[in-house]
Amino acid sequence: MSQAVQEVVQTIDVQATPERVFALWTEPEGLVQWWPEAAVFEPRVGGEIRLEFPQGHVTGEVTRFEPPTAVGFTWIRSDFPGYPTRVDVSLTDLGDGRTRVELVHSGWDALPEDYVAQWKPVHNAGWEHFLRLLDDLIAGRPVDKTWGAVEE
C-alpha cells in the first residue's frame, strides 16, 4: 500500500470491572451474549480464536493475553483469508466499577487499497456497533446482534 493507513480505534466506558469485561471478551459464553453467534477462544498466547457470524466467520490466533487488562488476536475473515489484520483490546480501570475499553484494529497498511477502501469503514462501524452492544449487555439493556452493514 502506498499511503499510510490509520488504525481503526474505538473507545467506550462501561459500568463493569476490568475482570468482568475481560471475561466477556475471552470466554465463549461471554462473547456470544453480545458479539458472534458461536465462539472458540483458547485463553493463551498462541491459542485459537474462531468467531461465527451469519455472514461468515473470522479466525485468528491470540497474540496477547494479560488478564484482566489486555487481549489481542489476529483477524482473518473467511471471505478474505489472505488479508490478516490485528485486533488489540486494552481495559483500563476507571474506579467506581467502571472500565474504559479501547479497541485498536491495525494492519490495514499491508493490505490492497481497494480492500481497505471497502472494508475498513465497515469494520469501523462494526466495532462501534458491537462495543455499544457490549455496553448494552453490561447495563442490562436488550442486545440486538443484527448487523446489516457486512451483508454484502
Walk through the language-model features, giving the residues of each.
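Hydrophobic ligand-binding cavity/cleft-lining segments
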Residues: M1-V40
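A conserved amphipathic terminal alpha-helix motif
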Residues: Q3, G107-E152
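Hydrophobic pocket/interface hotspot
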Residues: V21, L31, I49, V62, ...
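Tryptophan-centric aromatic hotspots in well-structured domains and transmembrane helices
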Residues: F22-W25, W34-W35, W75, W108, ...
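Residues at helix-coil transition
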Residues: T26-E27, P36, P67, R132, ...
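Hydrophobic-ligand binding "helix-grip"
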Residues: P36-V40, E52-R98, S106-D109
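Short coil-to-beta transition motif at edge beta-strands of beta-rich domains
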Residues: P43-E48
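Charged, amphipathic alpha-helical coiled-coil/dimerization segments
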Residues: V101-E102, E113
